[in-house]
Amino acid sequence: MSNITITETAQTHFANLLGQQPEGTNIRVFVVNPGTQNAECGVSYCPPEAVEGTDTEIPYSGFSAFIDELSLPFLEDAEIDFVTDKMGSQLTLKAPNAKMRKVSDDAPLVERVEYVIQTQVNPQLAGHGGHVNLVEITDDGIAIVAFGGGCNGCSMVDVTLKEGIEKELLNQFVGELTAVRDATEHDRGDHSYY
């Protein structure tokens, strides 16, 4: 069974929408290009004839959510919410594992660090058009990273490394990582954020 949360407000929203659809219509939650940097999540109507034998069905009050076999592991820990604020109402879908499958706690250190970088660090850097990649982890526990995009050449990269990335990684990998170092040959240009 998948660990997907659809909040009460989102369930009410879906039930209202589905009430205007043909009998037996449910919803489908899916990921296009799962496991890649181009992964995109979506929700669509799912008429009875579109249900596949390999789909996972998650029943809710008044409807079911169907998830295809390929999307399922990438929707682990996903949350669908319907939020109303002064700007209006919108459906939000957060799927932290859409771009990269969740790794187990006993996976090799390099896989666990890469997972945290891709799912927690890079989404924050993306707002500035930047990203960071793990180059290697040395024998003495130093994570070597390389910045790209808007982070390359940015005057704030040292602060981002020390106060953001290093603090986050050392906090999550106590006793396993000792430091985080930048291996980027920074080239300041129009692409640089600051």
UniProtKB/Swiss-Prot annotation:
InterPro entries: Fe/S_biogenesis_protein_NfuA, FeS_biogenesis, FSCA_dom_sf, HesB-like_dom_sf, NIF_FeS_clus_asmbl_NifU_C. Homodimer. Belongs to the NfuA family. This is Fe/S biogenesis protein NfuA. It holds the Pfam family Fe-S_biosyn. GO terms for molecular function: 4 iron, 4 sulfur cluster binding; iron ion binding. PANTHER family: FE_S BIOGENESIS PROTEIN NFUA (PTHR11178:SF51), IRON-SULFUR CLUSTER SCAFFOLD PROTEIN NFU-RELATED (PTHR11178).
